[in-house]
Design a protein with these regions (language model features):
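Phosphate-binding beta-alpha-beta segment of Rossmann-like dinucleotide-binding domains, i.e.
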Residues: 4
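Inter-heme linker and motif-flanking segments adjacent to c-type heme-binding CXXCH motifs
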Residues: 12-260
């Protein structure tokens, strides 16, 4: 008689009441640990991994998770060439000593700060701009533990995932950036995922226009999301030198040391 895996191996994704392991689940490995750990260790007759370490989504995750037709991995990260592995690690890492659905990669794991203050090190995989990372964990870390940034500019709420975190004036991070696996900007331009940003600000991409929420001019302020100045505001464009005078590092933090 078939047995439901989750009847013995607890899965938080199926526990809508948040009750935790019950009955036959007590004392047994979690579903994620069991499934990812077992499949991640599988080898063929020659001893080669059936699911390649660090392989593409099509060769690994999509063998079980929703695949190409569902497009569960899309948005800015996918457009940038990042794979599931770059954020989550390989199957053995996912099936290791982490709490499923809780110990997840974070925005701050790759966006570790700004142009003047961000993580450095030979064990980090940097994007061409030298600021952002292309891997949410340190090279050589078999557990793929998400990096914690020392700079809080792009940091999630303490103890919270991105999808539950809030930023500017209590707004959900997802309200401006999109959902975790479909962060803006998304291609193609005319895509259902882009409807919200189109409706809110008239074009695709991260919701960045202050006039989306604010009906009045905000003037010369650096109190926007992540310490930004007013965007699309003629008053700031005309008088921004007043902000820059005496403290160009305020500008360099985002525009770079050369202010380009």
């Amino acid at each position: 008689q078939p047995v439901l895996c989750a009847s013995c191996h607890y899965s938080a994704a199926l526990d809508l009441e948040g009750a935790g392991p019950q009955g036959d689940q007590l004392g047994k490995p979690l579903m994620s640990e069991t499934m990812h750990g077992f499949h991640g260790a599988l080898t063929d007759a020659s001893g080669n991994n059936i699911f390649p370490r660090g392989g593409s989504a099509a060769d690994t995750c999509y063998q079980c998770h929703p695949g190409q037709n569902t497009e569960c991995h899309r948005g800015a990260m996918a457009d940038g060439g990042m794979e599931c592995f770059d954020c989550h690690g390989d199957m053995l890492a996912v099936g290791g000593n982490r709490t499923p659905w809780a110990d997840m990669p974070k925005c701050q794991s790759c966006h570790t700060g700004d142009a003047l203050n961000h993580l450095t090190g030979s064990d980090l995989k940097f994007a061409p701009d030298g600021i952002r990372l292309l891997q949410a964990w340190r090279n050589g870390d078999t557990t793929a533990t998400p990096i914690q940034a020392s700079n809080s500019r792009f940091k999630e709420d303490d103890g919270e995932l991105y999808r539950f975190s809030k930023g500017h004036e209590g707004m959900a991070c997802t309200a401006c950036h999109g959902s975790p696996h479909a962060t803006w900007p998304i291609t193609p331009e005319y895509n259902n995922d882009n409807v919200a940003s189109y409706e809110a600000q008239g074009h695709t991409g991260t919701i960045i226009e202050c006039s989306t929420c604010h009906t009045e001019s905000l003037g010369n302020t650096l109190e926007g999301p992540h310490g930004m100045h007013a965007v699309g505001n003629t008053s700031f464009v005309d008088d921004h030198e007043d902000v820059a005078d005496g403290n160009l590092d305020l500008c360099r933090s985002c525009h770079g040391a050369d202010l380009k």
